């Protein structure tokens, strides 16, 4: 079941986040699996599997196979495995959680499908969206962002630390996790509001164990 401590440092990634790796699709897949294991060994508190963008896998069978490998690693190290967006995949794999955005399946539908099976995270980009979600008991936490500019969400308006503050000040009690452009250097600004989710801060770090350690301790 859901424990808000798992939001402390969530690694979010798919094979597309290793575009800086030389080689083809399989090299990116292997880089993801190697990085995930290193990150789990270094004590990330959760992993969110996210296949999105031009370089993401397109074949559902390949996506499922990769998701299963990631899930196995999470089980080995006792970290929650969360599927981004793909509710059906989360159900098939009996994932621990599912995370959806405002443009994905309607949250009411996600709740109907996943309630009592997965914990549910919902992305919000405005205070209004957060206020709308506050009474949805089945939503375990809110993902807030992008806090800083980020290549993974080029089309999204940066919301800044201000939105985290507004949500907290509004009296919303749900746990929050900040995402978008978070690095070891700006993570300390966010800790008072809840957890942090990162992609490139781990995926592109030269020393991944050091990056995780710094993000955990700073944050």
Curated annotation (Swiss-Prot):
Keywords: Magnesium, Metal-binding, Thiamine biosynthesis, Transferase. Its EC number is 2.5.1.3. One of its GO terms (cellular component) is cytoplasm. GO terms for biological process: thiamine biosynthetic process; thiamine diphosphate biosynthetic process. Pathway: Cofactor biosynthesis; thiamine diphosphate biosynthesis; thiamine phosphate from 4-amino-2-methyl-5-diphosphomethylpyrimidine and 4-methyl-5-(2-phosphoethyl)-thiazole: step 1/1. 4-amino-2-methyl-5-(diphosphooxymethyl)pyrimidine binds at residues 48-52, 84, 123, 153. This is Thiamine-phosphate synthase. It comes from Helicobacter pylori (strain ATCC 700392 / 26695) (Campylobacter pylori). The gene is thiE.
């Amino acid at each position: 079941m859901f424990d808000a401590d798992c939001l402390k440092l969530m690694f979010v990634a798919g094979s597309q986040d290793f575009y800086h790796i030389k080689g083809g699709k399989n090299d990116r897949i292997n880089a993801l699996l190697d990085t995930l294991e290193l990150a789990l060994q270094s004590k990330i508190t959760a992993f969110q599997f996210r296949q999105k963008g031009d370089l993401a896998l397109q074949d559902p069978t390949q996506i499922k196979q990769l998701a299963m490998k990631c899930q196995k690693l999470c089980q080995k190290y006792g970290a929650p495995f969360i599927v981004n967006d793909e509710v059906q995949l989360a159900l098939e794999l009996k994932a621990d959680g599912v995370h959806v955005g405002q443009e994905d399946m309607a949250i009411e539908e996600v709740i109907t499908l996943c309630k009592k099976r997965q914990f549910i995270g919902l992305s919000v980009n405005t205070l209004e969206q957060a206020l709308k979600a506050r009474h949805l008991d089945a939503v375990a936490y809110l993902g807030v962002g992008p806090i800083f500019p980020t290549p993974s969400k080029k089309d999204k308006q940066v919301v800044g630390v201000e939105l985290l503050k507004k949500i907290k000040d509004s009296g919303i009690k749900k746990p929050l996790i900040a995402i978008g452009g978070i690095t070891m250097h700006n993570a300390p600004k966010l800790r008072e509001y809840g957890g942090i989710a990162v992609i490139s801060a781990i995926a592109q770090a030269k020393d991944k164990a050091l990056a995780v350690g710094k993000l955990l301790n700073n944050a």
